Regions:
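Conserved C-terminal structural/oligomerization subdomain of aldehyde/semialdehyde dehydrogenase
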Residues: 1-111
Length: 111
């Protein structure tokens, strides 16, 4: 059942949860009806359909026909209660920066 604890929480271990679904819309609803969103996976022979599903899954990363295909250049991070921000890639560098705008009037005058 989609409401089971094992299907609702992130379990950092070798666990696979398999839930039946009737159609595409139900599969997306089950995938997104959780408080977490670190990663997800889609396995399909139809790459176009898999890409469409991956775009609708609310997760920081979605793997298609593989598991953890990332590299040091690939941003990694979650959505929802899985956290915000990204590790690795240019997105990670942004988390170390504080952007500041300084505007200076260079006209000489009495101030």
């Amino acid at each position: 059942e989609p409401g089971m604890q094992i299907a609702q929480e992130e379990i950092f271990g070798p666990v696979l949860t398999v839930l039946p679904f009737s159609d595409r819309e139900e599969a997306i609803a089950i995938a997104n009806d959780v408080e977490y969103g670190l990663t997800g996976g889609v396995f399909s022979r139809d790459i176009k359909q898999a890409l469409n599903l991956a775009q609708e899954i609310e997760a920081g990363g979605v793997y298609v026909n593989e598991w953890f295909g990332g590299s040091v250049e690939t941003p990694f991070g979650g959505m929802k209660k899985s956290g915000i921000g990204r590790e690795k890639g240019f997105e990670a560098l942004d988390s170390y920066l504080q952007t500041k705008n300084i505007s200076i009037n260079l006209d000489e005058g009495d101030y």
